[in-house]
């Protein structure tokens, strides 16, 4: 298999530059002294995001590390796929939630982690689970997860900055003549929108690519199509709770973790439609491919 990490390194660098510019720009609204502090804050946050982005996602999902004895099937599949790909094996985690989903996180293949929820482990058969883990490993080996984790951390910080700007506009006023309360108010209103746009920008095309790469790694596109169909139905029955810290990490999941009818499910629709992804995978398999009754 051929992996494509270089383009995502460049995208990550551009995201960090954008992130820094946004922080400095918000700082400038509060005056020169605050802008200087914002520069230092941007440098510190870039370092923190780069080295700790995996911890943010795992913490949000209350994920716990597991070994071969605790999760033998998951461990066996990931070890086999990593060997096939000639890539490092990531750390494995399980999140104890009925919501069926999976995600990968970490700044590079040697510092990566793959997490499955108990819901997805109970829902899928081994062939489907293998397809899902192949999808997640494709994110790891293409270095999608670095840009995804940076985007998620950026979204969290942007939301925090928006809240700060809102309270500053409410209580800070323009007493020292160095701030523009209208501009600050605009930041507080547009910040959450910017956070959502960032997540959307890095997520949708990655999922199509990971579907294709994962199907090539496992050699079983129909199993992934079947898994996506089950996950989509399962999310409607058992979605993740609509909490901000989970919304900030939603783009990492293999499928949108929120119920489609909920407001947050529409606002944070970071994934392409499941039907489109399934259609592409079935096209990969070919029109004459036998559909296993255990899958469909």
Curated annotation (Swiss-Prot):
InterPro entries: HtpX_protease, Pept_M48_protease_HtpX, Peptidase_M48
Chain residues that bind Zn(2+): 135, 139, 207
Single Gene Ontology BP annotation: proteolysis
TM stretches of this protein: 10-30, 33-53, 145-165, 182-202
Cofactor(s) of this protein: Zn(2+)
GO cellular component: plasma membrane
GO molecular function: metalloendopeptidase activity; zinc ion binding
Keyword annotations from UniProtKB, A to Z: Cell membrane, Hydrolase, Membrane, Metal-binding, Metalloprotease, Protease, Transmembrane, Transmembrane helix, Zinc
Cofactor note: Binds 1 zinc ion per subunit.
Active site (record annotation): 136
Membrane topology: Multi-pass membrane protein
Major place of residence: membrane
CDD domains registered for this protein in UniProt: M48B_HtpX_like (cd07336)
HAMAP family listed in its UniProt record: Pept_M48_protease_HtpX
Family: Belongs to the peptidase M48B family.
PANTHER family hit by this protein: PROTEASE HTPX
Record protein name field: Protease HtpX homolog
Source species taxonomy: Bacteria, Bacillati, Actinomycetota, Actinomycetes, Mycobacteriales
Primary gene name: htpX
């Amino acid at each position: 298999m051929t992996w494509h990490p270089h383009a995502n390194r460049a995208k990550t660098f551009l995201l960090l530059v954008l992130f820094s510019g946004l922080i400095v720009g918000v700082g400038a609204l509060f005056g020169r002294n605050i802008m200087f502090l914002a520069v230092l804050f941007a440098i510190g946050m870039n370092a923190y995001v780069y080295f700790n982005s995996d911890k943010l996602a795992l913490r949000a999902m209350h994920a716990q590390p597991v070994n071969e004895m605790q999760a033998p099937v998951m461990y066996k599949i990931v070890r086999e796929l990593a060997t096939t790909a000639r890539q490092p094996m990531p750390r494995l985690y399980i999140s104890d939630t009925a919501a069926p989903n999976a995600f990968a996180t970490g700044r590079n293949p040697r510092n990566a982690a793959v997490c499955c929820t108990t819901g997805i482990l109970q829902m899928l058969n081994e062939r489907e689970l293998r397809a899902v883990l192949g999808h997640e490993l494709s994110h790891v080996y293409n270095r999608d997860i670095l840009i995804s984790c940076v985007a998620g951390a950026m979204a969290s910080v942007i939301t925090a900055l928006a809240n700060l700007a809102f309270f500053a506009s409410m209580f800070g006023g323009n007493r020292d003549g160095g701030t523009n309360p209208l501009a600050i108010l605009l930041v507080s209103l547009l910040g959450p929108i910017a956070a959502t746009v960032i997540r959307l920008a890095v997520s949708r095309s990655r999922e199509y690519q990971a579907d294709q790469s994962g199907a090539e790694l496992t050699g079983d596109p129909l199993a992934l199509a079947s898994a996506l169909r089950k996950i989509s139905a399962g999310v409607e029955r058992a979605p993740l709770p609509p909490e901000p810290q989970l919304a900030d990490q939603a783009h990492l999941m293999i499928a949108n973790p929120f119920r489609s009818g909920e407001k947050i499910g529409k606002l944070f629709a970071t994934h392409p439609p499941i039907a489109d992804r399934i259609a592409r995978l079935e096209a990969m398999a070919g029109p004459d491919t036998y559909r296993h009754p255990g899958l469909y």
